[in-house]
Regions:
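Extracellular/periplasmic juxtamembrane segments that couple receptor/chemosensory ectodomains to their
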Residues: 198, 204-212, 216-218, 223, ...
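Extreme N-terminal signal-anchor transmembrane helix of membrane signaling/transducer proteins, especially
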Residues: 1-28, 32
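Alpha-helical transmembrane helix bundles of large polytopic membrane transport and channel proteins
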Residues: 97-158
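Extracytoplasmic/periplasmic ligand-binding sensor regions of membrane-associated signaling proteins
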Residues: 137-221, 296
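Extracellular/periplasmic ligand-binding regions of membrane signal-transduction receptors
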Residues: 43, 50-83, 99-117, 154-164, ...
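Solvent-exposed, extracytoplasmic
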Residues: 79-92, 178, 182, 192, ...
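Generic short beta-strand
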Residues: 98, 135, 148, 238-239, ...
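Short extracytoplasmic/periplasmic juxtamembrane "stem" segments immediately C-terminal to an N-terminal membrane anchor
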Residues: 32-51
Length: 320
């Protein structure tokens, strides 16, 4: 009888060991598969951002090398070049706007109209608007005057509006100041565009034949949808950060903007978020890349994660 009990006990111990081994083996296999999946997500995200960059770089370089100088041209002369701008934007869906700013403070921009509450609030465009022109020119007194023009998809003018309050000095912008040498293409870090609030980057190059800078705004929209589609389980989360640790996108959608004590609007960091689903990722963002990390939270939950980093346009980005 004792031998039978001993035999049964040994079987139970052996069964427990087998179950324990299988559990840990399956856990390692699952984690390994998950990490490989997210490596693919990081690669896809990096490729998406690279493609966005290349879609605008050629157009900026072409614009920077044109012989046309619109710095002192009246609006009517500038509008002769509208078909070029619109054709360029039509063939580059990721481009939100194409523009030139000049050393005398004048400015000419053509953008595709993407309906949003913010765009309607800022511009109140007429029905049927497909393209918008924002222009600042010098009048006869040497003062800068602003205008908004709204066109339909066939480039028929719907409305021209003089805007006395429109004051946009391109010389004060980061993209203008960094483009100091002709022949060099420069890129900003991702940020929210002042018009429309879209997430994107700006490419800029000093013009060769005019005293100014050519630039383009490139949208990075769709990154949040990409991260949402990449989730393996309902409780898995992904966040894309820039080199400053600010949230560019997450599987929970685009983050809201914050305003600091100086009145400067900025993207939030993980430390700024009050979303409990993203808080565990704040610890991951401080860990060495490509190292699996186990996080034991105060509420008893255990999270497994891994930070990944990749470079786009010479800047380090981090995806968790």
């Amino acid at each position: 009888m004792h031998i039978a009990y001993l035999f049964i006990g040994l079987l139970l111990v052996f069964s427990c060991l087998i179950l324990w081994y299988q559990y840990h083996a399956s856990t390692r296999l699952l984690l390994g598969t998950t990490y490989n999946h997210y490596r693919s997500v990081v690669s896809e995200t990096a490729n998406e951002m690279e493609q966005a960059y290349h879609s605008g770089s050629l157009l900026v370089e072409l614009l920077a090398n044109q012989r046309n100088d619109m710095a002192t041209q009246p609006l009517a002369d500038r509008l002769q070049h509208l078909p070029f701008y619109v054709t360029a934007l039509r063939n580059s869906p990721k481009l939100a706007a194409l523009y030139t700013g000049y050393d005398n403070g004048t400015f000419f921009l053509v953008r595709r109209y993407i309906p949003s509450a913010e765009m309607i609030r800022q511009f109140d465009p007429p029905a049927g608007t497909a393209w918008m022109v924002q222009s600042q020119t010098l009048n006869g007194d040497g003062k800068i005057t602003g205008s908004y023009l709204f066109y339909n998809d066939k480039l028929t003018l719907l409305e021209q509006r003089g805007v006395a309050a429109y004051r946009f000095d391109p010389r004060m912008r980061n993209w203008y100041q960094m483009a100091s040498d002709p022949g060099m293409l420069h890129s900003t870090s991702p940020y929210r565009f002042a018009s429309g609030g879209l997430l994107g980057i700006t490419l800029a190059a000093r013009m060769v034949n005019a005293p100014g800078v050519a630039g383009s705004d490139i949208q990075l929209n769709g990154l949040d949808a990409m991260l949402q589609a990449a989730r393996i389980t309902p409780n898995s989360h992904l966040v894309l950060l820039n080199a400053q640790g600010q949230i560019l996108a997450s599987d929970l959608g685009l983050p809201g903007l914050l305003t600091n004590s100086l009145g400067i609007v900025h993207l939030p960091t993980l430390a700024d978020t009050d979303n409990p689903q993203l808080l565990p990722l704040a610890q991951l963002s401080r860990m060495p890349p490509l190292q699996p990390v186990s996080l034991d939270l105060a509420n008893g939950e255990r999270w497994e994660g891994m930070p990944f980093t990749f470079k786009v346009l010479g800047e380090k980005r981090c995806a968790c």
